[in-house]
Amino acid sequence: MPFTLGQRWISDTESELGLGTVVALDARMVTLLFPAIGENRLYSRNDSPITRVMFNPGDTITSHEGWQLHVDKVNEENGLLSYTGTRLDTQEANVTLREVLLDSKLVFSKPQDRLFAGQIDRMDRFALRYRARKFQSEQYRMPWSGLRGQRTSLIPHQLNIAHDVGRRHAPRVLLADEVGLGKTIEAGMILHQQLLSGAAERVLIVVPETLQHQWLVEMLRRFNLRFSLFDDERYAEAQHDAYNPFETEQLVICSLDFVRRSKQRLEHLCDAEWDLMVVDEAHHLVWSEEAPSREYQAIEQLAERVPGILLLTATPEQLGMESHFARLRLLDPNRFHDFAQFVEEQQNYRPVADAVALLLAGNTLSDSELNTLGDLIGEQDIEPLLQAANSDREDAQAARQELVSMLMDRHGTSRVLFRNTRNGVKGFPKRELHTIRLPLPTQYQTAIKVSGIMGARKTAEERARDMLYPEQIYQEFEGDTGTWWNFDPRVEWLMGYLTSHRSQKVLVICAKAATALQLEQVLREREGIRAAVFHEGMSIIERDRAAAWFAEEDTGAQVLLCSEIGSEGRNFQFASNLVMFDLPFNPDLLEQRIGRLDRIGQAHDIQIHVPYLEKTAQSVLVRWYHEGLDAFEHTCPTGRTVYDSVHDELINYLAAPESTDGFDDLIKSCRQQHDALKAQLEQGRDRLLEIHSNGGEKAQALAESIEEQDDDTSLIAFSMNLFDIVGINQDDRGENLIVLTPSDHMLVPDFPGLPEDGCTITFERDVALSREDAQFITWEHPLIRNGLDLILSGDTGSSTISLLKNKALPVGTLLLELIYVVEAQAPKQLQLNRFLPATPVRLLLDKNGNNLAGQVEFESFNRQLSAVNRHTGSKLVNAVQQDVHAILQQGEAQIAKAALGLIDAARNEADEKLTAELSRLEALKAVNPNIRDDELAAIESNRQQVMDALAQAGWRLDALRLIVVTHQ
């Protein structure tokens, strides 16, 4: 094309330069000025990587003064173009804009503009863009979206609770599963769903101080949720950045004590507009009608301001009706306002629970039982269901299930309370205790005597704590020269046990980090035993490495030495041998230690070894735990209650372990109290609540569906394709592990979610569960989600040219592959993606406007095509520009019908689902006061907004590929 001064051109290789203007010419060279960056570039007149910028009628262009023109007509005179049309800001018609006055910062964003401007992408990027659109749209439509991405086993009762609660508007529930059933995981799954769907954006987690790191680790490791820990130091630091320090982060963890201590801090927390709050160990919130505790009042203040609340507690309601009521009162103060009325209501649920038990037993129902059911579900005609349930017909079981669902919907606290018990959930191992009684060394005896004389002023509790750890008493007197491990018989026993069980993995837990470190050194130096250490002084990454080394089967560590705090939040189901080098001070911590191995998914019975020194507090405690509470071999929900009731007596025995007069009687009375409480718990088991929390067959089916999805290989193929194109190196390490590292030629210099030093990934859930250092890649992982956003939010792959070698078609035949996106714009919290995610529609048009997409599948067609370099591609485009415009117009006419079909289907689905949910809850509200007015109002408002947003849905061209037939 001949050059003329004043013409506008664009660089094919440096599109960021904007529009260039021809400012000088000679026989062989042309000089372009790029005003946007104030630089000149020199190009050869022949075959340079630059493209003439020419707009067409229908385009909107911008002048260098900033106003826009809708082009009606294009004129050419002496090689220069001028555009005539309507000025958009003043609506003035027949305005002419010469090309030299076009805005130099022009960015081509429409696929067709990029194609005509010579901004042609690689063919593989176009294919990746289409796949990304397709997969993203499919993933949003999955019914279990938000439940697959976590690094957890697929346990039905957990999935059931998370699926039910995670989809609610601002859920306010009490999760009260027994110890070891995974309340933290359930809460994490609910958070993950709410954050992923946009229903929540700001989350606050309030936990006891000792559990802060456990939550931090669990949220990051299992759910890829990066929380910030707020303590006094962090709070003070953030005050420099914002008036309200809590507004500097979206996801925050802090301790209950931190919340309670300062009035100003509590006010800042209340003002920070959280969407969801999680409170762990909610049984620590003490309440009575006359005197609620400071902690309770602080959480109550927050609960009034935060729409969604998850309270977690392992304490069953039978051990304290009043405190159970207090927790429910936090969730819904209007519903739970009178304790006496609540107690009466609870007693009225007994006939409902009995009715459920009857239906589940499968026996024939008597007339009086049928009448009772009729009375309980009185507001609608259930006669046909009752007849079916009482017959031998095939649908009898289904009818009984439906009646159970109706009863559960209508009665009890089933919408606000979930509680699974070990009795109701199968799959737990047995626990076997082995106690090893060892003599107290003379060195310890002397140290204890001296300590008793010197510590006469200490309280009984301080002396009791000292007596639990004689090695520390000895070390205090001896200083750095003390080597307690040389004579402590527990060390000898441990070495003997480990050397005689070399093929077995053993978890050793002790109270203090120093003990763990000293034991590691002794085991390594004396016996060459491979031991990993795990304590609170290590970073999360160091702990991951230690855990991964312990998890390796052949070359890994035989033993993992953990301190009390260091082991929080970590589970090692692959090991079944637990050694307690010392004992913790209270039953909760004991259960927490055993809980590291005693989880669902543990394949073997757990062997618990307790080597203890006689005449120390350990010998007292081991008997009290085992004989008084049966706390080693069974979970002990009564432990805390019994411990609190005998606290002072027990402390005195621990402080002076040689004086055991009356200790047998104490053990006996504790055992009686424990048995009575346990019987009370068993008798008061709320079968109704357990059935509802467990989820039954529905939960099982959900777990199986997700497991099936785990086996889908399309994610692996897509991920590898994505990593290749983004420029991420992949190194296959075997055992289903791949190491990803950034390369020097990345699509973006800093890929979000990929650390500078890389990371190890796996696509296998089982591998991810046993290897804590490997990230579990699913469609919900930040690496994949960020990759999809990176490709789809920019123009990567939005315009390309390919050659089709096909002798059945004439040379030069044109095809245009158009990828349209049908979408609706709306705030994220409306979760429009459930009904109409950005959905790609593919058209493959020939010159006559025939759509061949139905006959020609994308992947097989893509394999037949070959790439064209950018320079040749630009020439091809210029030669067929008019034809492409004509085909594009035919595409616009055809997409409307397909898009409107998708939009109508989405509107019908949304209307049906949201109206059905609203009607169901409105009908139930008449008989179940646990349905909140604000929840109904939110569903109605949400339905209206969703319908309005879908009415505004539209479509746009997202990507196109020009295909030219060749015979070579």
Curated annotation (Swiss-Prot):
HAMAP family xref list: Helicase_RapA (MF_01821)
Domain Helicase ATP-binding: 164-334
Listed EC numbers: 3.6.4.-
SUPFAM superfamilies xrefs: P-loop containing nucleoside triphosphate hydrolases
Protein family according to the UniProt entry: Belongs to the SNF2/RAD54 helicase family. RapA subfamily.
Entry-linked Pfam families: Helicase_C, RapA_C, SNF2-rel_dom, Tudor_1_RapA, Tudor_RapA
GO molecular function, one term: helicase activity
Domain of life where this protein originates: Bacteria
Name the UniProt record assigns to this protein: RNA polymerase-associated protein RapA
Ligand binding (ATP): D177, E178, V179, G180, L181, G182, K183, T184
Record's function text: Transcription regulator that activates transcription by stimulating RNA polymerase (RNAP) recycling in case of stress conditions such as supercoiled DNA or high salt concentrations. Probably acts by releasing the RNAP, when it is trapped or immobilized on tightly supercoiled DNA. Does not activate transcription on linear DNA. Probably not involved in DNA repair.
Species for this entry: Klebsiella pneumoniae (strain 342)
Domain Helicase C-terminal: 490-644
Subunit structure: Interacts with the RNAP. Has a higher affinity for the core RNAP than for the holoenzyme. Its ATPase activity is stimulated by binding to RNAP.
Motif (DEAH box): 280-283
Keyword field: Activator, ATP-binding, DNA-binding, Helicase, Hydrolase, Nucleotide-binding, Transcription, Transcription regulation
Gene Ontology terms: biological process: regulation of DNA-templated transcription
PROSITE patterns: HELICASE_ATP_BIND_1, HELICASE_CTER
Catalytic EC class: hydrolase
